[in-house]
């Protein structure tokens, strides 16, 4: 990679938290499981090799019950999202820009549909995907886990916060990344969180922080290494994750009660993120996310400073808390017009100015969707993917060896459709 940052092994281990354990047990058991852990007096199941024929009957019943729960949950979420969509339309009113974006988004999705269908099939039917694990008590406080196929030791973990303009984010948007990283022996936890108008930015940051806490305190029950947890966000998710990380560091500096610490995060990866709301509000307005909506999402202009990580670093207390942050690597395409790459440049400068370990990686000619969608769907070599994996496996010689021998990722969408999608992408 472009001189990847070296990270130190944190000394603090993650210990089990005491919430939503029954929900973990509902979704975790599979054909390769064994009772090994107790949280809050209830058994969890740790993934191990081997099967027990005696358990086949209960497992069959469980799978039937799990399918029923999935159907019920899907119906409930569909009803919820439909209602929120109509509420959002009332906020948006009639506007040329956002209607044009909606039409472009529809065409964009249709062009990439061959790849989306393949990913969706794996998402719903792969045994390596654990969907909708509850991590909190608020709506959409759920996460998806993408697990490697082998169980030879504890795996590094990526907590991923999806993008979606703070409005259309959903945990399944990270499914392609999750599946591809799982092929490299990396567990991925894709967080869902309340979007606008169901919640505003403070709700989103709270949800993300609670999801990170859940992973830190429970991932060992799923075969994850609690001392090798990486945080990643994309687009709006990068902004939300950065806010959560900086807020947690500030709380830690002040000695406040916390359920996870920034020292438990090995590194933060920010992909195509925006970190200064003052500079983004007019930019988004011109691209169809109208100023009135943006102000509603961000709880008014008076909250811009609080939710602008770049600006917050100017506060002496927050600047001091930045010394607690893990190494930060910001990735951005130089041709990103949705969120200009200057957002990552100036945030990197601000972090370095207060002594934080920060690095910027720019990809020449790449757009907002090239890095996260078109390139992964194209298959073969992918600079961003290789850069992320090289950091995660930097201290794992076996992992680096396996990476060098890994077969090229398969193409999911024909090149012609990818080029057309790039031209009409609304992002």
UniProtKB/Swiss-Prot annotation:
It catalyses: [protein]-C-terminal S-[(2E,6E)-farnesyl]-L-cysteine methyl ester + H2O = [protein]-C-terminal S-[(2E,6E)-farnesyl]-L-cysteine + methanol + H(+). Gene3D superfamilies: alpha/beta hydrolase. Substrate binds at residues 163-165, 234-236. Induction: By ABA, osmotic stress and salt and heat treatments. It is a multi-pass membrane protein. InterPro entries: AB_hydrolase_fold, BD-FAE-like_dom, Carboxylesterase_B_AS, GDXG_lipolytic_enzyme. Pfam families: BD-FAE. It is found in: Endoplasmic reticulum membrane; Golgi apparatus membrane. The chain crosses the membrane at residues 102-122, 157-177. Coiled coil: none annotated. Residues 26-59 are annotated as: Disordered. Keywords: Endoplasmic reticulum, Golgi apparatus, Hydrolase, Membrane, Transmembrane, Transmembrane helix. Catalyzes the demethylation of isoprenylcysteine methylesters. In vitro, is specific for N-acetyl-S-farnesyl-L-cysteine methyl ester (AFCme) and has low activity toward N-acetyl-S-geranyl-L-cysteine methyl ester (AGCme). Acts as a positive regulator of ABA signaling. May be involved in the demethylation and inactivation of isoprenylated negative regulators of abscisic acid (ABA) signaling. Carboxyl methylation is a reversible and potentially regulated step in the post-translational modification of prenylated proteins. Plants overexpressing ICME exhibit enhanced ABA inhibition of seed germination and ABA induction of stomatal closure. Plant silencing ICME exhibit a reduced ABA sensitivity in seed germination assays. This is Isoprenylcysteine alpha-carbonyl methylesterase ICME. It comes from Arabidopsis thaliana (Mouse-ear cress). The gene is ICME.
């Amino acid at each position: 990679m472009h001189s990847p940052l070296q990270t130190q092994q944190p000394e603090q281990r993650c210990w089990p938290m005491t919430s939503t354990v029954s929900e973990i047990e509902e979704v975790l058991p599979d054909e390769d499981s064994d009772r090994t852990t107790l949280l809050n007096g209830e058994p969890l199941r740790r993934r191990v090799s081997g099967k027990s024929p005696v358990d086949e009957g209960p497992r069959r019943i469980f799978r039937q019950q799990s399918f029923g729960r999935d159907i019920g949950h899907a119906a409930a979420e569909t009803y919820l999202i439909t209602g929120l969509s109509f509420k959002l339309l009332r906020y948006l009113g009639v506007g040329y820009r956002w209607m044009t974006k909606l039409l472009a988004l529809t065409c964009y999705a249709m062009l990439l549909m061959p790849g989306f269908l393949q990913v969706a099939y794996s998402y719903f039917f792969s045994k390596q995907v654990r969907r909708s694990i509850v991590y909190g008590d608020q709506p959409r406080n759920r996460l998806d886990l993408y697990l490697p196929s082998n169980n030879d030791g504890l795996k590094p973990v990526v907590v991923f916060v999806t993008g979606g303009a703070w409005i259309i984010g959903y945990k399944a948007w990270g499914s392609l990344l999750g599946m591809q990283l799982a092929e490299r022996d990396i567990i991925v936890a894709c967080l869902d969180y309340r979007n606008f108008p169901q919640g505003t930015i403070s709700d989103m940051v709270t949800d993300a922080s609670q999801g990170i806490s859940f992973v830190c305190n429970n991932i060992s029950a799923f075969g994850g290494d609690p001392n090798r947890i990486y945080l990643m966000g994309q687009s709006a998710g990068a902004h939300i994750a950065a806010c959560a990380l900086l807020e947690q560091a500030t709380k830690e500096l002040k000695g406040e009660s916390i359920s996870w610490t920034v020292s438990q995060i090995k590194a933060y990866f920010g992909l195509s993120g925006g970190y200064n709301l003052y500079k983004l509000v007019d930019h988004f307005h011109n691209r169809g996310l109208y100023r009135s909506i943006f102000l509603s999402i961000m709880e008014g202009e008076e909250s811009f400073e609080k939710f602008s990580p770049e600006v917050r670093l100017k506060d002496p207390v927050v600047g001091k808390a930045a010394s607690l942050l893990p190494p930060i690597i910001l990735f951005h395409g130089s041709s990103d017009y949705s969120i200009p790459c200057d957002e990552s440049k100036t945030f990197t400068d601000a972090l370095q100015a207060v002594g934080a370990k920060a690095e910027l990686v720019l990809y020449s000619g790449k757009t907002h969707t090239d890095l996260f969608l078109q390139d992964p769907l194209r298959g073969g070599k992918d600079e961003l993917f290789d850069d992320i994996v090289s950091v995660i496996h930097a201290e794992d010689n076996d992992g680096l060896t396996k990476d060098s021998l890994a077969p090229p990722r398969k193409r999911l969408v024909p090149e012609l459709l990818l080029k057309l999608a790039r031209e009409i992408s609304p992002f």
